[in-house]
Each structure stands twice: as C-alpha cells, then as structure tokens.
C-alpha cells in the first residue's frame, strides 16, 4: 500500500479507536524506510502507546488478582496462566517497537529532536519490558532502558530548550524510571525538579505551537514531585498514569 494511504488508514483507525490496526499501518509506513515526518512519528507513538498501554493495564489487574488468590491453587493457576498470556503479548509488542527503532527510526533520524524522541521511546519500551521481567532478563531490560534514556537526556540538554515538550516528556519518563524501576526516589525528585525549574526559568522561550504540551508536562512533573515528596506516598502505581 502507498505510504499516504497507510497514513490515512492509521488516522481512520485512530478515530475508530482501533489501535492495533493503527499500529499495523504505521509499522508498514516505518518499514518503507526513510525518515518519518512529525505527524507520522506522532501517529506511530500514539498507536503503540495505546496498544501496549492496554496490556500493561491488564497485566497489573491480573497480577493483583493472582496475589489475592493465594490459598486457592486452581484460581491462582488460572490467573498465572492468563497473566503469562498477557505478558507474551506485551513482550511481542515491545520487541516490535524496539525492532523498528533500532532498524529504521534511530538510524534514519537526522534532527536532534527526532533522535531524542526515538531514544526516549526506546527507554520507554525497555522499561515496559522490565516491568514484567525477572532475573537476568530484568537486569538487561533495566540497563537498556537507562542507557537509552541517558543518551536521549544528554542530547536534549545540549540541543533543545528546557521548555521543549519532548525534552520535558523525557525528563518526566526518566524520573518515573528512577522512582518505579530503580526505587530511587531521591534521583527521581532531583531530575523532575531540575527539569521543572529550568523550564520555569525560561518560560519566555515557550513556543506558541507547543505551549499546551509543555505546560501540561510541567504540571505532571509538579504533580509527581508533590506525590513523591509527600510523607504519604500512596500507591506507587499511580505514578504511571502521568507518563508522557
């Protein structure tokens, strides 16, 4: 199918909230090679974020049920089997995205903004893998996630304004990684606070087009800081809702 037709198909699928179809169309666009436009890049990101998000949410629900059914072997075995099925789906989706990133997207990215966007995405999808991994696999996915986030972070600090929504979104997700995956609230808070303060100091550089995106992410950073620094930290799972 022609690239423009695939993009149109992805937009239709998004309107219909059929995100698996949307992801399939954007995967085909990516596999045609060449650099994606901003619009195409965002369509790809939205599609897979919804596809993987549904599985992450399901996995958390079933994991919780599995823990609550201790003492009832049959129920627990059924929950475990179902969790593993969801886990496999989640891993396949993440590996799909990581394959596209390594084979096409990161390699073809020329602008700093694109490189940061894709490296952040790489960090995100290794983070999602690490949430369901154990043992050596967990260590590998955590290390890969941190490396991708760090690479993106270094480029963003050099090449992008502190108010840029992609730089802010990266800081948000990297701080969530430190809090939830590395259990390092101190580092998470420092990173989020620095990103927020640097953006506040340069509010006059806010781009009119991205004003809404930037201020929304700044609010999320502030919300996380409040949650993480309060004595009653609540349920850590709540943090994930404020990802970019």
UniProtKB/Swiss-Prot annotation:
Protein's organism: Oncorhynchus mykiss (Rainbow trout)
> What does the record give as the function of this protein?
Adapter protein implicated in the regulation of a large spectrum of both general and specialized signaling pathways. Binds to a large number of partners, usually by recognition of a phosphoserine or phosphothreonine motif. Binding generally results in the modulation of the activity of the binding partner.
Gene3D superfamilies according to UniProt: 14-3-3 domain
Q: Which SMART domains match?
A: 14_3_3
In Pfam terms, one family for this protein is: 14-3-3
Tell me which family the UniProt entry assigns to this protein: Belongs to the 14-3-3 family.
Q: Where is this site: Interaction with phosphoserine on interacting protein?
A: 56, 127
Induction data: Repressed under stress conditions such as netting.
Protein name listed in UniProt: 14-3-3 protein beta/alpha-2
Q: Where in the cell is it found?
A: Cytoplasm
